[in-house]
Swiss-Prot record:
It comes from Oryza sativa subsp. japonica. Belongs to the protein kinase superfamily. CMGC Ser/Thr protein kinase family. GSK-3 subfamily. One of its GO terms (biological process) is brassinosteroid mediated signaling pathway. PROSITE patterns: PROTEIN_KINASE_ATP, PROTEIN_KINASE_DOM, PROTEIN_KINASE_ST. Interacts with LIC. This is Shaggy-related protein kinase GSK4. It catalyses: L-seryl-[protein] + ATP = O-phospho-L-seryl-[protein] + ADP + H(+); L-threonyl-[protein] + ATP = O-phospho-L-threonyl-[protein] + ADP + H(+).
Amino acid sequence: MAAMPGGPDLAGAGGAVAVAVDAMQVDDPPRASAEEKHGPTIMGGNDPVTGHIISTTIGGKNDEPKRTISYMAERVVGTGSFGVVFQAKCLETGETVAIKKVLQDKRYKNRELQIMRSMDHCNVISLKHCFFSTTSRDELFLNLVMEFVPESLYRVLKHYKDMKQRMPLIYVKLYMYQIFRGLAYIHTVPGVCHRDIKPQNILVDPLTHQVKVCDFGSAKMLIKGEANISYICSRYYRAPELIFGATEYTTSIDIWSAGCVLAELLLGQPLFPGESAVDQLVEIIKVLGTPTREEIRCMNPNYTEFKFPQIKACPWHKIFHKRMPPEAIDLVSRLLQYSPNLRCTALEACAHSFFDELREPHAKLPNGRPFPPLFNFKQELANTHPELVSRLLPEHAQRHSGF
């Protein structure tokens, strides 16, 4: 890892660790096979290209009249092994939407669709509707029609990096707080683990600064005692238990990923830029030090007898520049814990003092406009300790809420 700005050069610390970790035969296993998939109406149409029009029928349930709506594909905004996401315009209403088009296995239900149908939160991307389309090769595609948000946190970060600037702290607070609100909702209400939190999967409205967690293609409802694949989550943001091959993990893997995103916003570059699964663990050990036997047991009991070279943790204040607020460093340290059960929850992160500025009575955006909604909590506060609720809801917000 390169030296952090204002911090130590850690490059020499990892040689012995790399040799030891390599002996663990930690590797990137292949991607999981297709999951259960299924969906609604089948419509004709070729692959989306600029100017191509896709038509579908919506309605027809609960005495709602059926109607045809058409979308004109305007530009591709994302591609991957899953398929393609393109920006489109509804010809009937003029509304801009994002359509995610994924190849559909006719034998299965689509897990992403099932999860998206179960969610409704201001910090989670919303599904408007969905439809199937076919190609001339008789391939079946599922089209998820979602609200369109023009920017991603990745692009916002890149903008500041290109300008050789750090993201202003007020935006770090605003974006991370909303990420944790979104995670608090998905972890508790539908009870889902996202499993791929990274800047590319966080959308930002540049006018309102509202943030939305997107891309539920890897998401899953985790069931205690049921095995899951460990090769999940993009490398820089992968929790150490996943690198250790754990298959019974919890939603705390998302908390680790969010901690990596927070550190990246503060530093202007990834905290753990590993070049492979092995190197990823090396990068983590160079910062957090060698995990204790108990920490290894919490991540994956199969590795407790494995002998790691003893590397001391690098103090967090040496990773970040001297002017970094102690509250920011404290929050990072509570998120990036080896033991999954020691990481704070998403709601506890929201209540952290790092975000106190957002709770001030007359707090506003730097341009004088109001913040996006921050305190309109609903189901995610069910069964939450009253003390935590009072920390999450400032007095001025309590007057307008049901809590």
